[in-house]
Amino acid sequence: MNSVLVIDDDPVFCNVVEGILHHDGYAVTTAGDAQTGISRFGELNPDLVIVDILMPGKEGMATILELREANPEARILAITGGGNFAAGEVLRIAELLGADNSLKKPFEPAALLASVKRCLAA
């Protein structure tokens, strides 16, 4: 069973993603902020980390860099709704910084599962 860590400040979003992934056979852990997520990453060494780019405090770009520094082989899926920025541009930058794939919110469950599978296959 593949393990996934979801780092997002929106608890409802975390619950939805956890449900989708759990239903598809993934073991899921969530973190409501970047620091907690980075700690859990070190403890759990998950197969994939899903990181929201726009979070209060330490934002997702810095989180991706820190995860990549801790483990260059980590699989990372960047997600964002864009906020005040163009989501496509934000996600392109996230991929340049080390995300293996990216996904714009909102998304359909099938799109999430396809992105997760692409990241894990990379």
Short names for language-model regions:
Residues 7-8, 31, 49:
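Conserved sequence signature across two-component system core domains
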Residues 11-29, 97:
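Two-component/phosphorelay signaling modules centered on CheY-like receiver
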Residues 32-36, 59-62:
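Acidic catalytic/metal-coordinating carboxylates
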Residues 39, 61-73:
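Short amphipathic alpha-helix used as the core "switch/output" element in two-component signaling
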Residues 52:
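Active-site residues of response regulator receiver
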Residues 55:
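Receiver (REC) domain active-site loop signature in two-component systems and cognate sites
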Residues 62, 83-103, 110, 114:
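Alpha4 helix (beta4-alpha4-beta5 surface) of REC/receiver domains from two-component response regulators
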Residues 79-81:
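Hydrophobic/aromatic residues positioned on beta-strands within the core alpha/beta folds
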